[in-house]
Amino acid sequence: MQVSDFHFELPDELIARYPQPERTASRLLHLNGNSGELHDGQFTDVLDLVQHGDLVVFNNTRVIPARMFGVKASGGKLEVLVERVLDDHSVLAHVRCSKSPKPGNQLWLGENQEYEAEMVARHDTLFEIRFTSEKKVLDILDEIGHMPLPPYIDRPDEDADKERYQTVYNEKPGAVAAPTAGLHFDTDILEKMKAKGVEFAYVTLHVGAGTFQPVRVDNILDHHMHSEYAEVSQEVVDAIKATKARGGRVISVGTTSVRSLESAAQHALKQGTELAPFFDDTEIFIYPGYEFQVVDALVTNFHLPESTLIMLVSAFAGYDNTMKAYDQAVNHQYRFFSYGDAMFITKKTS
């Protein structure tokens, strides 16, 4: 398939620049993957769509305030976007400035250039940066970093984003982009789901800035996915097996949870074993023709045209169903992308 097969026209006014006043106030488009039926609704309809005995899998990564501003020794301004925290004092980052720093160059980061750092090495398009402070990197980021809003939100981050560009169940810091399907859940709806007999499990995938990179090839088979770190614990594996055994569904909240679970499944297939814990980097690329091993239903936001995420949704729901759903979403004025509305999709099995 061609990347252009996943194109759709999106009016600029449908891109959500701010979240709804309440997390659950978004709309929800329900897509039945087998019949192709579409139903417009509200996000709170999730309570009717999940069933007793289902397992809902969330990504518990925490978004770090990964964007920093500062200057080089020459005085030139620069912007640093952390891609990954390497240890307590070092990060791998994207650097934007007029002239790329070289190994050994000093950087001063923060509004008042309060933190000194050194450019240690360059790794392809990323820079390894080490802070000289005794403070830990995560503490420095909490002090001087900005929330790394996606480029299409196209506004400076605000104080409210520290809460709203973060799930209520976040636990493990490391992401530089939110697992956005999870932004719709508040504590009230989670408690109501539990009261209904729905079980929860948590994987971790630290979403990287690569999730916003455009696909730069024509044929999707030529695309190489960026690498992200994922964790699927023994507890999650046991919960999945128990759910399948009782006839329940595994419902993934977000494409990052899908990629975590299916990475574990693909690793097990290659090893010739049953589903097992997975703690590793993954470059899994899911596109039409992929056979899902774990996930039965998916909660996800509306994604960018020609992105790997709309390809994943097309693999899950069927290409024609997906493009029809996106056409309806545009016509019915759904809000798109990170702060936008959501879909609930059951897998196409026939």
From Swiss-Prot:
InterPro entries, alphabetized: QueA, QueA_dom1, QueA_dom2, QueA_sf
Gene Ontology BP term (one): queuosine biosynthetic process
Top-level enzyme category: transferase
Subcellular location: Cytoplasm
Pathway it works in: tRNA modification; tRNA-queuosine biosynthesis
Keyword vocabulary terms for this entry: Cytoplasm, Queuosine biosynthesis, S-adenosyl-L-methionine, Transferase
Superkingdom of the organism of origin: Bacteria
Purpose: Transfers and isomerizes the ribose moiety from AdoMet to the 7-aminomethyl group of 7-deazaguanine (preQ1-tRNA) to give epoxyqueuosine (oQ-tRNA).
Oligomeric and partner information: Monomer.
Record's protein name: S-adenosylmethionine:tRNA ribosyltransferase-isomerase
